[in-house]
């Protein structure tokens, strides 16, 4: 987050900076505490306005995947894997929930 920025504004900015994705920000989806590194990761639902991605210089690759094609072993962060898994489970159940998770 930057000064004078809300968490959702920060998430939208990071999404643009990292993936170059044009999104319509949705609601909070997961809050993941990572105490061993003194971090809290917030993930939001969002809708892509365009499937065109323009990743920033810190990003090696940004692509869209069908759920069955997600390269789980290649995801950089455990919090991303957990969030994607929970989202796919919620979507299959027909109800998107907010998840509060503590990683130990």
Regions found by a protein language model. Name each.
Residues 1-28, 32-86, 90-99, 103-104:
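Unchanged
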């Amino acid at each position: 987050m930057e000064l004078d920025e809300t968490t959702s504004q920060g998430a939208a900015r990071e999404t643009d900076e990292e993936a170059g994705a044009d999104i319509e920000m949705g609601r909070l989806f997961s809050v993941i505490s990572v105490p061993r590194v003194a971090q809290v990761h917030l993930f939001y639902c969002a809708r892509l306005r365009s499937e065109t991605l323009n990743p920033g210089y810190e990003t090696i690759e940004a692509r869209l995947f069908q759920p069955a094609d997600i390269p789980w072993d290649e995801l950089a962060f455990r919090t991303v894997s957990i969030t994607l898994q929970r989202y796919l489970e919620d979507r299959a159940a027909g109800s998107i929930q907010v998840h509060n998770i503590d990683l130990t």
